[in-house]
């Protein structure tokens, strides 16, 4: 079905290669890293003005940026972010968008270290297919049922009117005060009459804390991949 949309000319593909980004961070001059080509901004302006829907098919290369000077990578991001932020904000706040995962060999090695690379990749695909209900007779109905379940839990959380959330375990000892008017939100969002999922798959139920109401220690016990660099378990302290 996705390929058939090309018949109406409604699909535009923007491909980004992280290996090219790595090469640029390593070898490009600082002037090149700081340069934001006009065509990038023109594309964002055109697509947002047309109220396009955005699908980001994202994968992860967990160790790709190891050995890269992060100051140079940060330099490039700092040049890009201010110029693209108005369009990114418009996408996030007014348009329909979704991020979906696509496994890579590198990613599967981290998730399934007990498998050979090829077998790990296939296992990754099989698990994603199951989690996204694509193995069901009617995947859309199955995922809609899941969203209805999340919506039921969301309403229950709102009915509790929690004052404070307390997290303990694994070294974590954290209290999170919630605003009186806080509301819980599930993974589905609306734009007019349309419903979309910012993240697929989704198990999300979330709210916001009181501005100065977070205190204690949060221990992240699983490695995280951030912009191509693995961050091992670490601790955050809030006061």
Task: Identify the function of each model-found stretch.
Residues 210-239:
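Long, well-ordered mid-to-C-terminal structural blocks that present hydrophobic/aromatic surfaces
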